[in-house]
Amino acid sequence: MKRSLTALTVTAVVAAAALTLTGCSGSTPTEDAAGATAGTDPVALTMWGTYGNGGNTAQTDVLNDTLIPSFEASHPGITVEYVDIPYDSLKQKLTTGAAAGELPDLARVDIGWVPQFASLGVLASLDETMDDFTTLADATYPGSLATNAWDGHYYGLPLDTNTRVLVTSQAALDAAGMSASPATFDELETMAANLEGTGIALFADSGLQGWNVLPWIWSGGGEITDEGLTTSSGYLDSAASVAAVQMLVDLYQADAIPNLITGNSGATSTSDGLPSTQYATILDGPWMRDIWTGQYPDFTPIYAPVPAGDGGSVSVVGGEDIVIPASSSNQDAAAEFVRFTQSDEFQLAMAQVGQMPVVESAGSAAAQADPFYEPFATQLATAKPRLAIPQSSEVDTILSTELTPAFDGSTTVQVALTRAAEQIDALLASS
């Protein structure tokens, strides 16, 4: 599967240019990289990323002022220039750069992009080029690692991660007569019954894409495909998957879930509805702490695992991966920086500015240093990735398009998931 960019067929280059903006321990140096550290062959690496997205300078400051200087000090002869690019522009820049043969040595990319670029031969397969890849990979959260897999190889390593957990408030728990967050599907339904007549909706979410519905399907014991990513039929439309989605549909039709989930842009957002106690629960991530601290300083959210069904408590993985373009002429030096990103030094420094570690031991250490991260680190132990295929954004469209009529009552959940599975089968076949 590994190909250099110069070996790409004309078709693949055209396909790369056609990609759209779809798509959220240190180690012993290699012999070649060690030569660079000795100063015999200076190497200047360039890395593209989005650490400054939204005007956030805290992460770029740590990277440029602390981490890169530390790496350069321990690797004489290798320098790293980080180029910050707006998130909305990075994928297009990578796409046009691939077509023109003008890519950096390293890139921090959204987890959903790795299969797309790997399928076009744009990325180096790290499991083939890094002798210690297995050791590094085994130290990360399995769900985060899986986002780098494509066609039997791994084209990156996790860089930072996140997941969604259940968030509620003491006011909502009091209104429902509960002493703790609902830990199971049954307790969630009990909470819904207890909230009847209070004017508080049980749960809210902003869509029906994979990010939204997969935690419920997985926790209910369902799957979206088989393990080998060859078929969706029989999995997405299984009895377990149907039952999990049916629970949401029943709650929606009982007015326990507002129509924000089916696309009503005029509905109160989850970030406003939870602190104002319009909504009793939502699923959300660690980034909400800073948002609520600024907008609702008196609000104290309560974080807990996704309610468990027959499949346990399972959420969805988000985050970014680090990749090496196959066109880079500095593969060994770039691999040295990839190794550095997996170290406790890098992971814990970034944790202090809001990036959740991908290395399990660093995740535990970050949770001990800041208990806020504990529920997210716990959830990541079982969290799963969305489908790691080039057409992942199309899967989201299929789910949303087919599930909306089921929520509105114009079709059944079984029919909706069967239709979705058939369309995903076609995507898997074309992959």
Task: Tell where the protein language model's regions lie, with residue ranges.
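Conserved N-terminal structural module of periplasmic/extracytoplasmic solute-binding proteins
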Residues: 3-10, 17, 21-115, 308-310, ...
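Long, aromatic- and glycine/proline-rich binding clefts that accommodate carbohydrate-like moieties
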Residues: 143, 301, 351-398
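Conserved C-terminal helix/tail region of periplasmic/extracytoplasmic solute-binding proteins
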Residues: 174-175, 381-431
